[in-house]
Amino acid sequence: DLYTASVVGSVRMCIRDRILMSNSYGVDNAIAKVPDRFKKDIGLEYDRLKWRNRRGRLESSLQILYDNSNRSEEELVRADLWWKQRESIVRSLIYKKRYKTAYKVASEHSLSSGPEFAEAEWLAGWIAHSFLKSQEYAINHFLNFYDNVSYPISVARGAYWLGKSYQETGNTKKAEEYFKAGSKFLTTYYGQLSFKEINYGGEFTLKEDCLLYTSDA
């Protein structure tokens, strides 16, 4: 009801203020005093995650992500903001060579559309392709990326990595199909890489009036 919502909002704001002001143990003490029925408020969970991640508390940040891994996109309320924290944590895990954990965190994003969804799917695919050597998983993620972008720079990027993943599986036909798709966008970095994959040693020229593209992921 409205009263409960008001109380939850007030409690959250108090804890959030404490989180923003505190640099050490004040946050944990403040959280401990929150009534049990409010402790799993998704807004508080996000603020705690952001605070821990900002201070490099990797393991406790992971615990919050694991505790909320079954939440839907709707339940997370701002799944796009949760993804920004996830992405930061994923890159820390890659730096530490914890690739399986990085993949788990990247792939459990709960997103279903939008630029953050595309970013998450590409990153999960890249980890699967480059570090886990699991091309089946990589292809699934890269397809999700490829099917959800529209700007040439992003389409070329998706096509190139699909080509590389199919190449690793030995499926040269599918690899060439995607390299050809990527090579249509020669004004992009991945378009040029795609061209080189199917025209080894070949040269290409760009029109003087070619456009500069932005990215949707």
Model-inferred region functions:
Residues 32-40, 68-79, 107-116, 144-152, ...:
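Solenoid-like repeat scaffolds
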Residues 173-190, 199:
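TPR/TPR-like (Sel1-like) alpha-helical repeat modules
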Residues 16-17, 49, 90, 125-126, ...:
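Conserved small-residue packing positions in alpha-helical repeats and bundles
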Residues 2-4, 9-15, 213-217:
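Conserved small/polar residues in nucleotide/adenosyl-binding loops
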Residues 12, 24-27, 38-48, 55, ...:
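Generic helix N-cap/helix-start motif at coil->alpha-helix transitions
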Residues 55, 96, 131-132, 169:
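Structural motif corresponding to the intra-repeat A-B loop/turn of tetratricopeptide repeats
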